[in-house]
A protein has these predicted regions:
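A conserved mid-protein helix/loop that constitutes part of the nucleotide-sugar donor-binding site
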Residues: 16, 221-244, 250, 254, ...
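Short alpha-helical donor nucleotide-sugar binding micro-motif in glycosyltransferases
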Residues: 170, 284-285, 292-297
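Carbohydrate-associated surface elements
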Residues: 182, 205
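Nucleotide-activated donor-binding/catalytic signature segment of Leloir-type glycosyltransferases, i.e.
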Residues: 267-285
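A short, well-ordered alpha-helix in the C-terminal region of glycosyltransferases
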Residues: 278, 366-380, 387-393
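Aromatic "clamp/platform" in nucleotide-sugar-dependent glycosyltransferases that forms part
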Residues: 305
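Short hydrophobic beta-strand element within catalytic cores of glycosyltransferases
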Residues: 322-325, 335
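Conserved acidic donor-binding segment of nucleotide-sugar-dependent glycosyltransferases
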Residues: 337-338, 342-349, 358-364
Length: 408
């Protein structure tokens, strides 16, 4: 069976979980066509991402002429389907964040993608994120293409539910994937009970090799925070917590691994609080470099304000590192307070500082016990082969149902 993965930007530094999923599906025997709207010129640091870029077709890279010709061809050869897809695009634009011309462009992109899918013999399209890629997949189906599904990761999708038309996308999809029970609950709120059965939880998973490193916590005083430097990850609160620790003469260092739009603000706050001796920012890192930082660290700290379920938490737990994080979204489904680390209320710098101090004051034996429990927990819940098998069954069922409806 051949499927297509449709993503707005792929590969991307923060989208390693999509790459991991695609490769696991291929090991399960599926053929996967990679299609990305844009991103062929993204800055990439990981060799695996560079290899994926070479396997990916980029819609906008084809140019306006190719897209226009594909649109004209679809309008002439399948006028009824094109009219239905156009009506659907107009409906999606009615309350959308972006204006009508964007949605007409999504329709044009869908026309080109439809041609590619027919040439490749694709039986199902899966979009990652409930944003424009899911709308394009929906329009491909409306044009007469294969059934589609999409994964909602959060948190951005949940911030813009009406603007993204998530409810309409769910109603038209063969199925929808949520990466946590919390995520599923938010999607259930959007649609009638008749559609609830199509919303399935498939957790992101780690590779078998991610579980093979055996390294317990030693006497390190370094705390590691991995993630895009942005408002939802809560690094500004982490700097405030670090200030409290420094003022109390607590011995620690903090490594911020990542980059993003708040880097300048975070760096300014570090300077304002005179924390340069305690905190450093590395910028973007490869998967191997992230792993190295986690192994050198005492614990992962991720003080998120909004999340889906961060893959880096899984990676840290697989390396037997305790996790300090927040009671947000899917995080408590994986991390249990006092068992695998510490959970605190989001936005509470005092509670975060207290949790970090408890971690720093804990004996290595206690941290090692937490690390082993974390390892067992993530291994039981987040193996990529299990996730790929779940997805494969869903893809096959969706394609089978589509064939039955066509013959019936």
């Amino acid at each position: 069976m051949r499927i297509a993965y449709l993503v707005n930007q792929y590969p991307k530094v923060s989208h390693s979980f999509i790459r991991r999923e695609i490769l696991a599906l291929e090991r399960e025997g599926l053929e996967v066509t990679r299609i990305s709207i844009r991103g062929w010129d993204n800055d990439l640091v990981d060799e695996a991402d560079l290899a994926e870029r070479a396997r990916t077709r980029y819609v906008l890279q084809e140019g306006a002429v190719s897209i226009a010709l594909a649109t004209a061809f679809a309008a002439v050869t399948r006028p009824r389907a094109f009219a239905w897809a156009l009506l659907l695009a107009l409906r999606m634009a009615r309350r959308a964040e972006r204006s009508l011309p964007y949605h007409l462009m999504y329709l044009a992109e869908a026309c080109l993608i439809l041609r590619w899918l027919r040439q490749a013999g694709v039986a199902h399209v899966h979009a990652n994120f409930g944003t424009n890629s899911a709308e394009v997949a929906m329009l491909v189906q409306a044009l007469g293409g294969p059934p589609f599904s999409f994964t909602v990761h959060g948190p951005e999708e949940f911030d813009k539910v009406p603007l993204l038309g998530l409810a309409a996308k769910i109603r038209h999809a063969a199925f929808v994937v949520a990466i946590s029970s919390f995520g599923r609950s938010q999607l259930l709120r959007l649609v009638e009970h008749a559609h609830w059965g199509k919303i399935q939880v498939v957790r992101c998973g780690l590779e078998q090799t991610d579980f093979e490193t055996r390294s317990d916590v030693d006497g390190s005083r370094d705390l590691v925070c991995v993630g895009r430097l942005c408002e939802q990850k809560g690094q500004l609160i982490l700097i405030e917590a670090a200030r409290r620790l420094a003022e109390a003469n607590v011995d620690f260092t903090l490594t911020l691994v990542g980059d993003g739009e708040l880097r300048r603000d975070i760096a300014a706050l570090i300077d304002e609080h005179r924390l340069a001796d305690h905190i450093r920012i590395t910028g973007w890192a490869t998967a191997a470099e992230v792993r190295s930082h986690l192994l050198r660290g005492r614990a992962l700290v991720l003080p998120s304000f909004a999340e889906g379920l961060p893959v880096v938490i899984m990676e840290a737990m697989a390396l037997r590192r305790p996790v300090i994080s927040t009671y947000v979204a899917g995080i408590p489904e994986l991390v249990r307070d006092q068992e695998h680390g510490w959970l605190v209320p989001a936005g509470d710098a005092e509670a975060l500082a207290a949790a970090i101090r408890r971690c720093l004051d804990s004996a290595p034996a206690e941290l090692q016990s937490m690390g082993r429990a974390a390892y067992a927990r993530v291994r039981a819940q987040h193996q990529i082969e299990t996730s790929a098998q779940q997805l494969k069954r869903l893809f096959e069922a969706g394609a089978s149902e589509a064939r039955s409806s066509q013959t019936g």
